[in-house]
Amino acid sequence: MLDLRMSSAVKVRVPDCLPGRLPDMELVGYLERWCLAPRSAGGNLYLHHIIAGDEAVVHDHPWDFQSEILEGGYLEMTCDGPVERRKGDVFSKRAEALHYIMTVRPGTWTRITTGPKTRD
């Protein structure tokens, strides 16, 4: 069972029994993802445990999204250069925004809210 008593900064109410990690959404050695609400075409809510950087794999997403750093943090490479993401940061990204995660602090957890899919 996932212990979300990481700090008072964690403000999500997690159900008593989290759904299992979604195997199709797990990037082995990099990211573990839990669905916090039923998946829908209008958007989704996820809890991410980021384990390691993206190995310099520049990518975008099929949807706009908002991220909140709940614990830890990471260094992200963007088209405008590196950006340090820290505990408490909340930011939004457009689907077409290219980026990758360079380095990750141990114990990094984020809450991701996606919008509807806008492209493949």
Regions found by a protein language model. Name each.
Residues 77-100:
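Short acidic-glycine-tyrosine-enriched beta hairpin
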Residues 59-60, 64, 85, 93, ...:
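A generic "structured core" feature
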Residues 44-61, 95-96:
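Conserved short histidine dyad/triad with adjacent acidic residue
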Residues 41-43, 52-54, 71-75:
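Short, charged/polar surface micro-motifs in flexible loops or helix N-caps
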Residues 60-75:
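Short, conserved beta-strand element in jelly-roll/cupin
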Residues 94-120:
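Ligand-binding loop in jelly-roll beta-barrel domains
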Residues 1-44:
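A short, N-terminal "cap"/entry segment at the start of jelly-roll beta-barrel domains
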